């Protein structure tokens, strides 16, 4: 098919602008965050080392491998989460009956005695391993570790929360979340995935993702509020970070996500924090389903993919609902006020309109 020369010229200019933006803005942001991560991980590792001395069941899993830290997630340029993987989940059954969307419980297997578990004192009378009890014990240990660690002058435990959050240099916040890694199993609540008759992801990639599994996190969540208080405290949140990252390999998918995060930092830090990196990552996964061919994720398509994701985001903000990729009954906007979401949709539309109507938009962004 012949393509008009002016269309080729416009596309070439757009590719040039996006590549320039990636080099001058995105990579600079990534470099700055990498420097911050190196500093804060050194401090967090020291705190976790002290925790392990006090309580050997909490073994630090924050290790650097091929330039990245396992279990570390960047929430924003100043907020981070470290997932601390615990050992010996084996004597518990994973119960995912749908009564707690986005969460599950760990119940002592039939015929197993409490004494067979490494976590015996955190098992409830009903035989559930309590996420809240484990987090409470971990909170106490971290508070003591902060007082003893060599960096105590620059790190503090954030008060008035059951979460374990460290404030470092009065600027960075690091949440440390106890978790279990569940490999080789897949939650029933995500059994519908992948949707039939959609060519992406490839069956081999699906098998890889399901083998990778998911994590169970001990943390507070708006999705559990209003449920039975005991069940809420005992429940563990489903977390699919590694599965999501695996799906985003290939083509310019990860580059799209890096550009989206940079645009978010520079233009979408709004009152009430309606939009976070995870919303953008979720919508990127939906965009992958809409555009399943690898040719739709090359350099020439990046602008179209970004616009598609922003238009999806506007729709979600206006409908006041953003479904989780693996658990669509879970609304990622839950707890956000309509006013905050409406304001965000206007900001996203301005950003999207600029990208759609100006070939030089990325010079200004």
Swiss-Prot record:
Gene3D superfamilies: 1.10.1410.40, 3.30.460.90. Belongs to the mab-21 family. InterPro entries: Mab-21-like_nuc_Trfase, Mab-21_HhH/H2TH-like, MAB21L/cGLR. It comes from Anopheles gambiae (African malaria mosquito). Coiled coil: none annotated. This is Protein mab-21-like. Pfam families: Mab-21, Mab-21_C.
